[in-house]
UniProtKB/Swiss-Prot annotation:
Listed SUPFAM superfamilies: PRC-barrel domain, Translation proteins
UniProt GO molecular function: ribosome binding
Annotated protein name in UniProt: Ribosome maturation factor RimM
Pfam families: PRC_RimM (PF24986), RimM (PF01782)
Bridged cysteine pairs (disulfide): none
Gene3D superfamilies documented for this protein: PRC-barrel domain, RimM
Family (UniProt): Belongs to the RimM family.
Lineage of origin: Bacteria, Pseudomonadati, Pseudomonadota, Betaproteobacteria, Burkholderiales
Species, as recorded: Bordetella pertussis (strain Tohama I / ATCC BAA-589 / NCTC 13251)
Amino acid sequence: MSEAAHSGAAPADLVELGRIASAYGVKGWVKVQPHSAQAEVLRTVSHWWLTRPAPQAARDVVASVPRAYQVLQARVHGGAVVAQLAGIDDRDQAEALRGCFVQAARSAFPAPADDEYYWVDLIGCALYSDADGEPRLLGVVDEVFDNGAHAVLKVLRQQIQPGQPGPVPLLDPKGRPLEELVPFVRAHIRHVDLAARRIDSDWPLDY
């Protein structure tokens, strides 16, 4: 293991941002495939925490617990991010990191611009719609992804029912959660209140 990596206590707010796809060049750089279009975080944080998938952990290049690597340089390369990590000096060392998940502490993210949000912060928010004139719960955000044009919220449908202590999941006839895909665009999103974990929209409830 390189002395540049350390396995001290990992931050409690680690967020998975991508996965190392391969080595890049012959000087120890790695190529990362980001999980989202918000790859700028990979370029701006000072440390990545790498975790090897369980089936590969026996190789002991990176333990199954996160290990921190200092990011010396990072830049966008096509749809990927390439980076130089401290202590990774040749292609063999870089190839040994192939498959590792790349995480960073949420507290280390740069502040987003006005009216911009990190996708990880939207997950778990309740989505409401006032398409019928009054705010009604549509569901809870389970995932955010990019469809090539804009971000999309995958919402697990929920409903407030009398006598129930909280929202009740809506299921299809086979007992599977009902899902709704809602574009995260100004045309439909009216307000985001991260402190209240609430997003207001005008998305039709029966779209």
